């Protein structure tokens, strides 16, 4: 210990100066934001390097005035002071702890979060400790933090392990170890929640909790508590650090010592025996590897701590990924060793076998292993990179509940990369974390490094509940998945930790510290793998998250960005993640809905549900997704949405994660997509419009249709609306199309008259009014046939103008049209010798038209005038007029049908089509016969009867068609409006 302390720059100036020399390389940086007071009187705790005064080992927090820390560090004295509960007893106790069942150790590990990471700057108010309790994400946080702690602790433990037994002072350590250990046991029994209890300490999760507890030792002084890596300096920290850590610190210490010659021989294996008796102190080389690795991590963390908080933020971003790499590395350690071997393998063994036992039993049995093994292994299917559907579903629900967890599942690829970074960590003794991390990044690809670092891949299998014999290849997949989830969660927690007040993010915060420490490595990885950042946060698609390598999901998950200002800087990445989250939310939807969109794939518009889903899920996306948008593109569903956003109607059906820049489709775009879908029938192109417009169109169309079931009213209304909408090239086109389709009867023959009528109508002064123009429909059929055909009605204002004037204009147009037809038919009758039947038809049509104009039209005109007369006592409302007009439309349609027939006859040289016409007449006369006894003795009477029957039939048919059309129009408009409105509102809300 002394040698280590001497060789290493002292983190603690012999005074309580806030800037303490880092354990490693004596980084000049002060602990993040730690006030001098809170900077930990490392000397007090860690008397310097060599001296391990029991009192000096008191947790820095205890020694330091609580208020001094930049972040209100609630002094963890409460929990720190519970020496007996200290999870890290003296070496003897540590040995006991090591002897303790893995479950207890796991519990302790879970509880360990109390350890300060030694980054006092990164203190965040701890949320309810319990809140962190059970979520897999939290477990992963714990795992990662434990891993990080392990890495960081290795160096600090190296300093502390031998002498302090990991308890700060042996005396305090024993007390704390016992008391804490007892409490740890209780916590172990209690489970994760107890670990959460740790958060209770000050109600704040501070990086110090992890790093201080874990890395505080190195800060305080190698001698005092390196083993505990935290502020083990006191029983308080020791409490938090199990002897596993102490052992690790011992092992790591050795490793560090070996790795860094400056680190004098780590305290004799006493710590290792105590901490990892089962592990047994393996070759120093093993320790060296692990130790150096942890040393690097620790030194990185330490340096990070000493760096400015800004550096911390930057490093956090980096270290987030880098640390994930480390954590992933643990997870990924390909190891043949089915279990953590009791003895650490020599570096050669570890290198050769990649199965070297994990240096720390804590690593072996740590709850983080369980968390990783149970959750990740389950999710990863014990070897499969992807979680089982059940696991994924569980994750999704759990992630939804704890958005933080989403990150867990999103970083499979990145985790491997980062894990690889561990290799670099191993070799470097106390290089600047940036330097180390850059090489680490370079070496990230070496799984062997990971295996070396971890010694045993077996840990990974354990973590994943995977066959311990699984090799790197399999493990890498599993680990990617598990690490992805775990690391992504860690990242998410880190991201959250950045924000963090979230209690569950303590680990992540600690991770973020390590990540910050390892920022260099993680930066490369982060930048290298947009996937890791861009992978859509698991939020949207937990299932996708596996495929999505990014751990960026972390961000998305954090619904509550904690106020931690220093972390805020890192948050941008989180934001990126958020973008991804949104995307992943979309991905989830888009996965299902991209298929939908593919199915619907209307102009490739993203489904409203997709956009809604994505927008809904990622409130955080909205928040943070902005930056990461490009990275987020991974979810192809989002990609589809993105295309729509770009305005590309091409459905981006591909769920390809290839589009890294996939952006959340704007609500408007998605809305557009949505609208086309609701419009079903209408051409998507026309429907592709802003929802608001569509809604109005629908409303306008629907309003008239609602006012009257009469198809004519609907037609006229739709005609008006459709004319305007057609002009606007919106869904009106489909409507118009439907109307023309609705009536094709004799359209050809009538077209000329219609045109003439239109011209005639146009000639009228009223035509200037759009309503009048609209009314200047060709023959009545045009109402049915082509509501859109009426060019005269360009203005939807008609809908707004539905008053007496508007209806008068419509009435005038209809009157003129009917009069024109009547005049034309009279002329035709005079000019041509028509058969009695034809004459009867002509007379019937003309008479019906004249009767309608003379009676109902006049009545309607009177109603319109009354409507225009404010003084009219029974003054009819526009709705009344619309209803009456609907009734008139029925009559007009009947007459129009008659004139259509006449036009057909005219086209046929006024020759009745015997076959069809007479057959129809004959067929129809029978009904008339029953209704009206077939006593007609004259052909005329028969013609009349046939005409009457035909007329009735036609009228019935017309009414039926009108009703169907009106219903269809209303249904379409209602559906469109409803869909567009529903979608639009959610979309807007989501966007908001």
From Swiss-Prot:
It comes from Mus musculus. The keyword Transmembrane does not apply. Signal peptide: none annotated. It comes from the Eukaryota. The lineage of its organism: Eukaryota, Metazoa, Chordata, Craniata, Vertebrata. It is a peripheral membrane protein. Pfam families: GKAP. Residues 162-171 have a biased composition (Gly residues). This is Disks large-associated protein 4. The modification Phosphoserine is found at residues 206-207, 377, 380, 384, 388, 405, 415, 421, 580-581, 609, 611, 665, 744, 973. Residues 1-20, 172-194, 915-925, 940-958 have a biased composition (Basic and acidic residues). The modification Omega-N-methylarginine is found at residue 290. Residues 528-554, 600-620 have a biased composition (Low complexity). Residues 1-31, 157-225, 342-396, 527-751, 763-798, 915-992 are annotated as: Disordered. Keywords: Membrane, Methylation, Phosphoprotein.
């Amino acid at each position: 210990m002394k040698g280590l302390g001497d060789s290493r720059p002292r983190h603690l100036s012999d005074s309580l100066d806030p800037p303490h020399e880092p354990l490693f390389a004596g980084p000049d940086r002060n602990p993040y934001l730690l006030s001098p007071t809170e900077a930990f009187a490392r000397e007090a705790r860690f008397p310097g390097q060599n001296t391990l005064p029991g009192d000096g080992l008191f947790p820095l927090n205890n020694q330091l005035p609580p208020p001094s820390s930049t972040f209100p560090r609630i002094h963890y004295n409460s929990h720190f002071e519970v020496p007996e509960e200290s999870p890290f007893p003296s070496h003897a106790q540590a040995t006991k702890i090591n002897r303790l069942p893995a479950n207890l150790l796991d519990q302790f590990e879970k509880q360990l979060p109390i350890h300060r990471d030694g980054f006092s700057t990164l203190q965040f108010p701890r949320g309810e400790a319990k809140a962190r309790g059970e979520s897999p994400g939290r477990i992963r946080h714990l795992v990662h933090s434990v891993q990080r702690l392990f890495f960081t602790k290795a160096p600090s433990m190296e300093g502390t392990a031998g002498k302090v037994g990991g308890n700060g002072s042996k005396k305090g350590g024993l007390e704390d170890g016992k008391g804490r250990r007892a409490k740890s046991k209780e916590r172990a029994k209690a489970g994760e929640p107890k670990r959460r209890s740790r958060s209770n300490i000050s109600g704040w999760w501070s990086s110090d909790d992890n790093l201080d507890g874990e890395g505080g030792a190195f800060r305080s002084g190698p001698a005092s508590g390196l083993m505990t890596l935290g502020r083990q300096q006191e029983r308080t920290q020791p409490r938090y650090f199990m002897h596993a850590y102490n052992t690790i610190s011992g092992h790591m210490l050795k490793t560090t010592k070996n790795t860094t010659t400056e680190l004098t021989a780590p305290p004799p294996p006493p710590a290792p025996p105590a901490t990892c008796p089962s592990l047994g102190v393996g070759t120093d080389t093993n320790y060296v590897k692990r130790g150096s690795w942890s040393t690097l991590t620790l030194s990185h963390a330490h340096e990070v701590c000493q760096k400015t908080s800004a550096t911390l933020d930057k490093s956090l971003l980096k270290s987030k990924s880098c640390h994930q790499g480390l954590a992933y590395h643990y997870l990924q350690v390909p190891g043949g060793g089915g279990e953590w071997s009791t003895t650490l393998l020599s570096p050669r063994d570890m290198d050769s076998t990649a199965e070297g036992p994990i240096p720390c039993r804590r690593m072996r049995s740590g709850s983080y292993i369980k968390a990783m093994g149970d959750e990740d292994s389950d999710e990863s299917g014990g070897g499969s990179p992807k979680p089982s559907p059940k696991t994924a579903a569980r994750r999704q629900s759990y992630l939804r509940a704890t958005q933080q967890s989403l990150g867990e599942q999103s970083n499979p690829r990145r985790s491997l990369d980062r894990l690889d970074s561990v290799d670099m960590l191993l070799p470097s003794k106390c290089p600047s974390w940036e330097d180390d991390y850059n090489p680490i990044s370079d070496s990230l690809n070496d799984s062997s490094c990971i295996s070396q670092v971890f010694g045993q891949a077996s840990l990974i299998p354990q973590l994943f509940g995977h066959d311990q014999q699984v090799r790197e290849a399999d493990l890498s997949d599993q680990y990617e998945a598990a690490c992805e989830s775990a690391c992504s969660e860690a990242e998410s927690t880190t991201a959250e930790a950045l924000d963090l007040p979230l209690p569950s993010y303590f680990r992540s915060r600690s991770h973020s510290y390590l990540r910050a420490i390892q920022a260099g490595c993680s930066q490369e990885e982060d930048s290298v793998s947009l996937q890791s950042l861009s992978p859509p946060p698991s939020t949207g698609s937990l299932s996708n998250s596996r495929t999505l390598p990014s751990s960026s999901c972390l961000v998305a998950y954090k619904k509550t960005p904690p106020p931690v200002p220093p972390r805020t800087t890192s948050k941008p990445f989180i934001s990126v993640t958020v973008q991804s989250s949104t995307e992943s939310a979309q991905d989830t939807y888009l996965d299902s809905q991209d298929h939908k969109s593919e199915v619907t794939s209307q102009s490739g518009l993203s489904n409203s549900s997709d956009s809604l889903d994505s927008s809904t899920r990622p409130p955080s996306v909205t928040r943070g997704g902005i930056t990461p948008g490009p990275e987020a593109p991974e979810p192809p569903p989002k990609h589809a949405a993105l295309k729509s956003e770009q305005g590309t109607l091409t459905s981006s059906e591909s769920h390809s994660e290839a589009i890294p820049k996939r952006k959340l489709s704007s609500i408007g775009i998605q809305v557009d997509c949505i609208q086309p879908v609701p419009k079903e029938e209408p051409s998507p192109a026309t429907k592709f419009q802003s929802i608001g417009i569509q809604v109005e169109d629908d409303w306008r169309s629907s309003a008239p249709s609602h006012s009257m079931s009469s198809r004519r009213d609907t037609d006229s209304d739709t005609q008006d609306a459709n004319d305007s909408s057609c002009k606007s090239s919106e869904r009106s086109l489909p409507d118009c199309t439907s109307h023309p389709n609705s009536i094709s009867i004799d359209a050809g023959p009538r077209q000329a008259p219609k045109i003439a009528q239109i011209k005639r109508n146009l000639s009228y002064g009223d035509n200037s009014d759009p309503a009048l123009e609209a009314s200047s429909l060709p023959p009545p059929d045009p109402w049915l046939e082509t509501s859109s055909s009426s060019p005269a009605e360009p203005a939807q204002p008609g809908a707004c103008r539905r008053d007496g004037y508007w209806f008068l204009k419509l009435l005038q147009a209809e009157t003129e049209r009917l009069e024109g037809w009547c005049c034309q038919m009279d002329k035709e009758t005079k000019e041509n010798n028509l058969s009695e039947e034809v004459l009867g038809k002509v007379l019937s049509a003309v008479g019906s038209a004249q009767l309608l104009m003379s009676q109902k039209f006049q009545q309607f005109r009177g109603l319109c005038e009354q409507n225009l007369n404010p003084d009219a006592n029974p003054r009819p409302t526009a709705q009344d007029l619309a209803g009456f007009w609907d009734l008139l439309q029925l009559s007009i349609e009947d007459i129009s049908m008659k004139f259509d027939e006449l036009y057909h006859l005219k086209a046929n040289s006024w020759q009745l089509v015997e076959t069809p016409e007479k057959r129809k007449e004959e067929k129809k006369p029978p009904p008339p016969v029953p209704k009206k006894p077939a006593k007609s003795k004259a052909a005329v009477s028969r013609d009349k009867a046939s005409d009457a029957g035909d007329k009735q039939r036609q009228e019935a048919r017309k009414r039926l068609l009108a009703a169907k059309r009106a219903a269809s129009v209303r249904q379409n408009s209602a559906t469109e409006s409803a869909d567009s409105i529903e979608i639009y509102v959610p979309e807007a809300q989501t966007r908001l």
